[in-house]
């Protein structure tokens, strides 16, 4: 359709899905790509925009007429942030972080999938080391809980009491996004704690059906 495709890789980039870029995991080739956060492992703020040659070429052509590349921000190209980002990327390669994610992905998928055994979980999904569980008042119809109950937010609070910090997302969803350096032992411990917390969440869910 002659429309540029931009991939937002701020969360999914740098190995999160088991490939360097999330787009690769879904066999998608974007025209432009945005990234941040894991670019420097979040030690210092930095972001970047990457683009294919067919997008860059007209920008370059116009810049040559102006005598300067017409793009920039007041705080761009900070040398310390750039140095930290460079070292972070070196460590990702040296420690084979992507290989580690691929090794743990089946364990992650299995453990998050087991959570569907709880009668208030309507759906689970994951790729690499990112996943989510979706709450449902009825597992068959996938009917949602009353949004005023904020079941996911309440569940997150209960889970936190068991030592795991997760995030409630719109639509009664809880996201899982563990550190890419997590060990298999730590991963299983995390899900063991979530399962214990979900026993308490079961009582909460029963009250609001």
What residues fall within each predicted segment?
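Conserved N-terminal phosphate-binding loop of PLP-dependent enzymes in the Aspartate aminotransferase
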Residues: 1-209
